[in-house]
């Protein structure tokens, strides 16, 4: 298994698919990385040379991935909550942030139903 950005990349899959195992790299970004490095997207990781894998590592390093990306997202959410803006309040209360209805649905965000006390 090749190791890129601290993640073990599966050897038996195509390069584009393998790169998506890195948090922050989706299909589109993986295709761009392959295009810039000149690596065949359909080639399997086990068939790539060490030099090609190094090129992939270098190109992936240019993007914000894994722990840095998670930290950045959490800091942005924390900033909203500290500001006390509407979006921050919704995050704090665990409700939908982007204007979805909450009278019905929103069960994933609100959690399991709470019984009515009498």
Curated annotation (Swiss-Prot):
PROSITE patterns: RIBOSOMAL_S13_1, RIBOSOMAL_S13_2. Gene3D superfamilies: 1.10.8.50, 30s ribosomal protein s13, domain 2. SUPFAM superfamilies: S13-like H2TH domain (SSF46946). GO terms for biological process: translation. Residues 93-118 are annotated as: Disordered. Pfam families: Ribosomal_S13. InterPro entries: Rbsml_uS13_C, Ribosomal_uS13, Ribosomal_uS13-like_H2TH, Ribosomal_uS13_bac-type, Ribosomal_uS13_CS. GO terms for cellular component: cytosol; small ribosomal subunit. The keyword Ribonucleoprotein applies. Keywords: Ribonucleoprotein, Ribosomal protein, RNA-binding, rRNA-binding, tRNA-binding. Disulfide bonds: none annotated. The keyword rRNA-binding applies. Part of the 30S ribosomal subunit. Forms a loose heterodimer with protein S19. Forms two bridges to the 50S subunit in the 70S ribosome. Located at the top of the head of the 30S subunit, it contacts several helices of the 16S rRNA. In the 70S ribosome it contacts the 23S rRNA (bridge B1a) and protein L5 of the 50S subunit (bridge B1b), connecting the 2 subunits; these bridges are implicated in subunit movement. Contacts the tRNAs in the A and P-sites. This is Small ribosomal subunit protein uS13.
